[in-house]
Amino acid sequence: MAMELFRVCLVVVTAIINHPLLFPRENATIPENEEEIIRKMQEHQEKLRLEQLRLEEEVSRLEAEKEALRQVEEEQQQLEAHTAWDLWTTLCMVLFLIIEVLRQNHQEGTFPECLGGDEDELSGLGGTLLQGLPLPNRATLDHFYEHCIRSTTGDATRTQEFVEGFVDDLLEALRSTYNGKTDMELEDFIGVGSMYENWQVERPLRCHLFIPFIPPEPYSFHPEFWCSSLSTPLERQGYGQIKVTLADGNPLGCVCGKAKLEEDMLCLLYGKNRGAWPSSAGCGEMEGLLCSRESSYLDVMQVMKWFQMALTRAWHRIAHKYEFDLAFGELDTPGSLKIKFRSGKSMPFILTPVIQCNDSDLYFILQLPKEPCGGGPASSAHWLLSFAVYEREFLRMTGKALPEGACHLSCLQIASFLLSKQTRLTGPSGLSDYHLKTALLHLLLSRQASDWKASKLDVRLQDLFCFLERSLLEKKLYHFFMGNHKVPEALGLPEVVRRAEPLNLFRPFVLQRTLYRNTVDSFYEMLKNAPALISEYSLHVPSVRASPPPKAVVS
């Protein structure tokens, strides 16, 4: 009963609560409120979007500033590192420069260790020198020199007199056809080389004569040294160019443009393009005239052709006076000539056209263009600077201060003899007689006069070979005159040469390893063969000496 009453009450209460009049419907205004809410939500969403964009921009700006700051820091670090590197590089360069200067001073002031001591110190070094290869003793050297070298002095004198007389006649024939307006004027010859320095031992004897020539008026030669330009490559050191100028110093075109030339005259001016030029004042009157309007430098090849043609003309004028023939000799030696006698014997000699450098004893000489190491073909406008006259004068001046019968030339003659025999045995190497003479000149300047007594021939010969050995091992043999401040001022060497950078004659060995290896091997083999070779020639002295040259027959 109670349960039924409770159910009835629950139904009544539920009906009252759900009656619409008691609780009005709240969603009657939903349409207006919903639009407002949606609008506000959209506005809020727009604000959120704008805020998001602002935050994104702020983040991007902060990241950009951070990246810029990082780049600035990196650049600053790189700059600091670069500055530190430049500082270290500069310090290293300064240090290397100081070391090089000290090394140069040390090399100028001292010589290889085998040159510094006296005879006792030298003999005490024993096998450390020249790979322990022994040289002949003094008695053997004296005997060899007296019987194989000194005895040929008379032949050298007679040969020299004969060649000089013939060359005088040849030059006189050239001068007889001289045209003062177009021809080069040839001056008197100058004797140079081993024949005129009294140490030649190679057979057959060969005289070497310089023939200076000058251009016709109003032209002049203006030498240009290699050391006047900072951009001169190493292979051009020791060379120069010859510019043809007017008397007032202004460069001008070739002589053939101003005068009528003979058919066999060559224009000697250097130029890139060769061939026949259009007809103009003189040039158009002959075909194939080797003349250039683009440059005023003398060309080595053209001068050689001109000189050979001039010698040929001169010989044809005087050939009837002599009972021998004259022919050109070695093709790779400009001015090489050979007198051929009817008996079959011959007498070689060299006539080299040269150009004097101002008023000095320096001469620019012909040298055929060669392929430099690692470069293109050499220019034929470059002339080799020769110190031959200064070398002859230095040996003469030094010889006067040495004891009577000094052994300096004897050392050079024996060394030259050994080198020539080794060359015939194994072929040519990178070592020449000029290197031997350069080494001797350095020794003469470094040692006292008393060290060159005749009784010290064996010690001085060992000095010479020790010097060459050290130079070969270091690949450095400096030219005696270029940049050498120790050369006596009495020689009158031009200041431009004294101030020049030293020239390393062994520089090719740095680039040509095969040549260097062959030269070193040949040098030590020469020393190894020296005792046996000298003993052999001392025992078997030739009984038949070279006969003096036939006298000229004048018809």
Curated annotation (Swiss-Prot):
Provide the protein's localization: Cell membrane; Nucleus outer membrane
**Which regions of this chain are Cytoplasmic-facing, per the record's topological domains?**
103-555
Tell me, which GO biological process terms does this entry list? extrinsic apoptotic signaling pathway via death domain receptors; negative regulation of extrinsic apoptotic signaling pathway via death domain receptors
Q: Which UniProt keywords apply?
A: Cell membrane, Coiled coil, Glycoprotein, Membrane, Nucleus, Signal, Transmembrane, Transmembrane helix
Q: Tell me the first and last residues of the signal peptide.
A: 1-15
What would be one Gene Ontology cellular-component term for the protein? nuclear outer membrane
Membrane topology label: Single-pass type I membrane protein
Which family, according to UniProt? Answer: Belongs to the ITPRIP family.
What function does the entry list? Enhances Ca(2+)-mediated inhibition of inositol 1,4,5-triphosphate receptor (ITPR) Ca(2+) release.
Fill in the subunit field for this protein.
Answer: Interacts with ITPR.
The protein's name: Inositol 1,4,5-trisphosphate receptor-interacting protein
Organism this protein belongs to: Mus musculus
Its ancestry begins with: Eukaryota, Metazoa, Chordata, Craniata, Vertebrata
